[in-house]
């Protein structure tokens, strides 16, 4: 990393790395999609979508894999149906898991009359440019996934769990997948209803649900 980005390494080392201000002119202008692999060693992969302006969580799901394009497409279609429309633009990282998603988004925006219609309705970005969802994963790691990691590690240290044993991993999924999804649902509800404070990195502040459903109240 030092060879490819020496300036960035030095900035991180001294705490001088500056985040960009995020600006979005409308509630459904963009959705940002990505996965979280912190619990993947235990067989639980998390996938999420965040609304650009409000930082509202659109979905937060646990599955065996967050690389299955059909599953991700299903999350997307379900959310589009619930929102009665698709975002103007969709941002994802480049990967085979996002291929179906990209095609669907561009198809849904085929008849759009704005600059992001059709093939421009989806854009592949690096994780460093997908800052809203990456920012949320950072919060999620601190607030929730670290608890689950410690919880499962206690099983390992007590020799209760052997991750090389298929019976153990399947039993772990059977016992905890629904509990973890229930926890994610609660995390989603809390996040969407809590107030985001003013920040020099954001143009608006307030509860994500309020900013999403009543964007006109936030300028």
Model-derived regions, located:
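RNase H-like DDE/DDD metal-dependent nuclease/strand-transfer catalytic core used by mobile genetic elements
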Residues: 2-13, 18-192, 196-201
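Long, compositionally biased intrinsically disordered regions
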Residues: 189-219
């Amino acid at each position: 990393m030092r060879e490819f980005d020496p300036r960035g390494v030095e900035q991180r080392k001294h705490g001088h790395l500056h985040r960009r201000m995020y600006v979005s002119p409308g509630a459904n202008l963009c959705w940002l999609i990505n996965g979280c692999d912190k619990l993947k060693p235990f067989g639980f992969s998390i996938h999420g979508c965040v609304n650009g302006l409000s930082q509202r969580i659109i979905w937060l799901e646990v599955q065996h894999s967050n690389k299955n394009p059909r599953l991700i497409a299903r999350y997307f279609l379900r959310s589009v149906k619930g929102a009665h429309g698709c975002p103007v633009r969709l941002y994802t990282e480049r990967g085979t898991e996002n291929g179906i998603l990209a095609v669907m988004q561009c198809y849904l925006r085929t008849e759009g009359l704005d600059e992001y219609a059709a093939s421009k309705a989806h854009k592949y970005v690096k994780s460093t440019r997908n800052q809203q969802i990456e920012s949320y994963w950072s919060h999620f790691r601190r607030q929730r996934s670290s608890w689950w990691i410690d919880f499962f590690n206690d099983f390992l240290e007590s020799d209760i769990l052997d991750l090389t044993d298929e019976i153990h991993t399947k039993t772990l999924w059977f016992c905890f997948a629904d509990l973890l999804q229930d926890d994610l649902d609660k995390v989603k509800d809390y996040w969407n209803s809590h107030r985001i404070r003013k920040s020099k990195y954001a143009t608006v502040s307030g509860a994500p649900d309020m900013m999403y459903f009543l964007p006109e109240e936030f300028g």
